[in-house]
């Protein structure tokens, strides 16, 4: 008869520390919850949460490359010097020289996702074999992630994030829209607090 989310310990633990262990000495909602239902905040999460964290990273990076190109914040030529991204675009251009830009971007993004996922699979298999872990608890107690990019792919990921930060996240058009959005939300909040009859159903 429970009406709501019935989250297992593993789900809560994965949400709380999918990016790794959390400091125990900080005051926060997660630490307060963990004091009642120990989430073992000083250990790495189980393998599913580690996969989710990397999948999130892969999705964000590739989505942002796609968005940045389609919004005209940077061009295909601009990404030519970005490791992984540039070579993949060059590979697609060489294979399909007459491809229009929309399809070029789509195919390159698809291949980049494939390359990064393959890297994670190979690296993680090696780490699991080296660690000899058989259970999620053994993985939690290992003291390091087992689901990970290779060292080379981690460097590519860092380079891509740096490029996106400089060319997209700090782009004046993005900052202008973010500023407008903050203003709209602030004004809407003020209106609804001062005039609650504007809320639906009131």
Regions found by a protein language model. Name each.
Residues 2-202:
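Histidine-centered, transition-metal-coordinating active-site segments
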């Amino acid at each position: 008869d429970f009406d709501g989310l019935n989250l297992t310990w593993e789900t809560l633990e994965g949400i709380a520390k999918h990016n790794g262990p959390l400091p125990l000495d900080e005051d926060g909602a997660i630490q307060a919850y963990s004091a009642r239902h120990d989430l073992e905040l000083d250990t790495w999460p189980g393998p599913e949460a580690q996969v989710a964290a990397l999948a999130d990273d892969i999705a964000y990076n590739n989505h942002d490359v796609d968005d940045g190109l389609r919004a005209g914040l940077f061009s295909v030529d601009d990404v030519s010097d970005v490791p992984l991204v540039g070579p993949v675009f060059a590979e697609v251009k060489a294979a399909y020289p007459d491809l229009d830009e929309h399809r070029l971007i789509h195919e390159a993004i698809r291949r980049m996702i494939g390359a990064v996922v393959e890297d994670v699979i190979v690296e993680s298999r090696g780490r699991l074999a080296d660690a000899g872990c058989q259970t999620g608890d053994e993985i939690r107690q290992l003291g390091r992630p087992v689901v990970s990019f290779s060292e080379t792919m981690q460097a590519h990921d860092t380079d891509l994030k740096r490029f996106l930060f400089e060319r997209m996240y700090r782009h004046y058009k993005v900052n202008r829209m973010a500023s407008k959005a903050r203003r709209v939300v602030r004004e809407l909040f003020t209106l609804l607090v001062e005039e609650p009859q504007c809320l639906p159903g009131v």
